[in-house]
Amino acid sequence: MRTQKKWLEEQLKKSNAQWKIVVLHHPLYSIKGSMNNLFQRTMFNPLVEEYGVDLVLQGHEHAYARMTAHGENGEAQAPVYTVSHCSPKNYYIEFDKRFDKFGTGSRYYQQIRVHGDTLTMNAYDATTNDLYDAVDIIKDKTGKSRLEDRGKEIPEALIFHSNGGKKEEAFQKRIDKYKQRKGIQ
């Protein structure tokens, strides 16, 4: 992993690109309760922050989640961290308050577009191709970013396919608790 860190730092250091996107298999902030990814986070997240990465695309955990960074005044800003998958397998996740949006029980893919001072990340349900999440990262002339969270108006899909059992019951309770916290019907 140290070799990967060294390589990533070299690439980010020499990059003068307006938009920086990092792709990782394991997420820096896990959405699975049994995983913390602390080693990965301490290796790579300082680089994400130091070199002004705008978007971190991650996988491995077989669900969807988006987390945004926040500035000193609490305003949403880059980097945006997404965890996504397109596998038929789904995992139980934790509904950590740091995340802005979750999706369970379906598959998701992202479309990233850049137009001038705006990077748009749209996430789609791979089964229906319906828009599921949407974020615009907008940079001013100084390079400071702000976020427009267009996904907050799109209902979260918290689908759970139960075969019965204690694990399934516990996960359904976590879903219900999260929905209550967010005011989701």
Where are these regions (language model features)?
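Metal-dependent phosphoesterase/phosphodiesterase active-site architecture
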Residues: 1-22, 28-33, 46-55, 61-185
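Charged helix-capping and loop-helix junction motifs
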Residues: 36-43
